[in-house]
A protein has these predicted regions:
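Helical hairpin unit composed of two closely spaced alpha helices linked by a short loop
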Residues: 131-133
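Active-site proximal loop and beta-alpha junction motif in alpha/beta enzyme cores
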Residues: 1-126, 138-185
Length: 185
């Protein structure tokens, strides 16, 4: 590809992408969705303050939203203190989430940096997840825990998430080649 900008079609939307610098790509991820029935949640409730009971332990102040797929984020002191191999599938499949949900435990490092531990819906524990980075950044910004330009650190690498005044989300991160393939058109 010699183009600096392309459109990427996902299963539910079209994303604008552009090459930035030597090895970064920026995606326009659109706006987050907060309406309870579009996240979706089973019932109408405050999506910014969800409490879940998992095996007798309460997880409070969960923030649920949709950024192309559903997410719930819990802000905690240490995101690796919780065993997502056990908690992840229980929260993902909780009755509150009719389409299941991605699960993120996030710790605020400072007003521009967050470290996360992510359970990806249908995939399990993951080393990185773009939509989880976007959802976490939006939730932290709305809760006034961070600014609107945030670095999200995963086990493997990091992504930069920016939001404009209308909450349009821009995700930027490095690209690495996993496999090279040719296709004749």
């Amino acid at each position: 590809l010699n183009n600096k900008e392309i459109k990427l079609k996902t299963n539910n939307r079209l994303l604008n992408a552009k090459i930035v610098g030597e090895s970064d790509v920026q995606l326009e991820m659109g706006k987050p969705v907060f309406e309870w029935n579009k996240i979706p949640l089973k019932e109408k409730l405050d999506h910014k303050n969800i409490t879940l009971d998992i095996d007798g332990k309460e997880f409070t102040y969960g923030f649920s939203l949709n950024v192309g797929n559903p997410h719930i984020i819990f802000f905690v002191k240490d995101c690796f203190e919780y065993d997502l191999k056990i908690l992840g599938p229980k929260i993902e499949n909780h009755e509150l989430f009719p389409d299941r949900t991605n699960v993120t435990f996030a710790q605020i490092d400072d007003e521009n940096n967050i470290t996360v531990n992510v359970w990806e819906r249908g995939a399990g524990l993951t080393k990185a997840c773009g939509t989880a980075a976007c959802a976490t950044a939006v939730a932290a910004f709305i809760k006034k825990l961070t600014k609107n330009d945030i670095n999200i650190k995963f086990e493997e690498g990091s992504l930069n998430i920016k939001m404009d005044a209308d909450l349009n989300i821009f995700m930027r991160g490095p690209v690495s080649e996993i496999k090279h393939t040719s296709l004749e058109i």
